[in-house]
């Protein structure tokens, strides 16, 4: 969940202080692959980075940054694009890469972006504002494909029940609003107890991941970071749910010479030269003070790797435990 600003006061990025501590000393050229409202980029510049390249696929994020980015002069360069191509966007070896995954607070808080199940808006969910929207997917995908997306990308146990309800609802007319979809999902699940998450949480996560191809983007981004980082360069990744954290954890384990497989069905892997070392024994989570200030940070996890001089190479997404959903066409 990339950090953002709400318009009332600056929102401090999740895990910023522990991230800066974990990658210290900060110097040279860094790339923030999920620029958002620029919180990490500013943190890196203030911590000592000579220059920061800010990459974001959301044109609105880069547009909003124009109000303050000029104050940093040529120390901050903004690029419209995806972090899966971060090595191309950088155009030079990097001393560090930061990735803050998922949807931003800014995107969640703007109802017209269609990410929120608590605010009525068009069923969109496109980070780049281009390509297939959530409404396209929900109204055109087959029931089987919808069920697979909900189960594999949202870990939703009631995936088949929800997919059936969506298909039945769209038969009466297109599903085009966020609250309409949230209501359909909620009717399929027990009423949550106080303090429990909204019943549409997992379904909205799954559809968003599918619309934005977030898992393939993540795997390609990790490979791109490996190619771009200098020996000694730092890779810091903040995740917000178990599926993406599993991919990052497995990538760093494999690339640091760790053994074992992501799951028993994954192909066997042979030992290779370590491309990263791991300065942290385990992932870092927000402390109580940060959670009190930002409850959305509860599921955040920070993982860090330090690049070695071993040559970069491709990685098999299946070995990383990336869910693969076969294309089954439209209804």
From Swiss-Prot:
It is an enzyme of class 2 (transferase). It is found in: Cytoplasm. GO terms for molecular function: rRNA (cytosine-N4-)-methyltransferase activity. The keyword Magnesium does not apply. It catalyses: cytidine(1402) in 16S rRNA + S-adenosyl-L-methionine = N(4)-methylcytidine(1402) in 16S rRNA + S-adenosyl-L-homocysteine + H(+). GO terms for biological process: rRNA base methylation. Keywords: Cytoplasm, Methyltransferase, rRNA processing, S-adenosyl-L-methionine, Transferase. Residues 308-331 are annotated as: Disordered. Its EC number is 2.1.1.199. It comes from the Bacteria. Specifically methylates the N4 position of cytidine in position 1402 (C1402) of 16S rRNA. NCBIfam families: 16S rRNA (cytosine(1402)-N(4))-methyltransferase RsmH (TIGR00006). Belongs to the methyltransferase superfamily. RsmH family. This is Ribosomal RNA small subunit methyltransferase H. The lineage of its organism: Bacteria, Pseudomonadati, Pseudomonadota, Alphaproteobacteria, Rhodobacterales.
